[in-house]
């Protein structure tokens, strides 16, 4: 399954067309979306899955505050975002993803969250993120700190 929604309540549950389902779930539950963009060959993606995404505190933060989606940056499955059809690969380009893994945050209405890092405007977090930093990252976005605080002061 190229695109999956992960519901973190102990076991991982997988669903087809999860991207659209995730956006609907986020809107109905007023939760932000975390998109984990990966490729099948990416060792750092697998490391982040095994460490950060498998951490109990991270799972709890995600379960309580976000809807998590995994997006295969080389996938060919068709998805709809903002009324337009994309392949997973096209959507990863739309989100300006050029390295893996990359983490993207969306508002509950599906809009990409922009934030600052070292006073530079960003729309995603490229690269592997250590578990402790990932927890801080989730809290930063959960609490809406991206509106006022530069992420570089947090991680």
Predicted features and spans:
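Bacterial Sec-dependent N-terminal signal peptides
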Residues: 1-17
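A short beta-strand-turn-helix
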Residues: 16-33, 62
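Extracellular/periplasmic catalytic domains that process cell-envelope and extracellular macromolecules
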Residues: 27-28, 60-63, 95-99
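Short active-site neighborhood of thiol/selenol oxidoreductases, capturing the structured segment around
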Residues: 29-43, 68
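Detector for the c-type heme attachment site
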Residues: 46-50
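Non-catalytic, surface beta->alpha helical segment in thiol-disulfide oxidoreductase systems
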Residues: 51, 93-147
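Thiol-based oxidoreductase modules, predominantly thioredoxin-like and allied folds used
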Residues: 55-86
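Flexible coil segments in periplasmic/lumen-exposed cytochrome c-class electron-transfer proteins
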Residues: 147-155
């Amino acid at each position: 399954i190229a695109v999956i929604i992960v519901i973190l309540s102990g076991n991982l549950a997988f669903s087809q067309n999860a991207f659209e389902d995730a956006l609907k779930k986020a809107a109905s539950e007023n939760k932000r979306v975390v998109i984990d963009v990966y490729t099948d060959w990416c060792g750092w993606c697998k490391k982040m899955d095994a460490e950060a995404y498998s951490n109990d505190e991270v799972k709890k933060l995600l379960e309580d505050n976000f809807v998590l989606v995994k997006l295969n940056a080389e996938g060919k499955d068709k998805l709809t975002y903002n009324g337009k059809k994309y392949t997973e690969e096209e959507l990863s380009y739309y989100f300006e993803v050029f390295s893996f893994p990359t983490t993207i945050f969306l508002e509950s209405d599906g809009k990409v969250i922009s934030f600052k890092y070292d006073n530079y405007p960003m729309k995603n977090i490229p690269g592997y993120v250590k578990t402790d930093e990932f927890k801080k990252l989730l809290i930063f976005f959960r609490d809406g700190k991206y509106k006022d605080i530069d992420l570089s002061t947090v991680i």
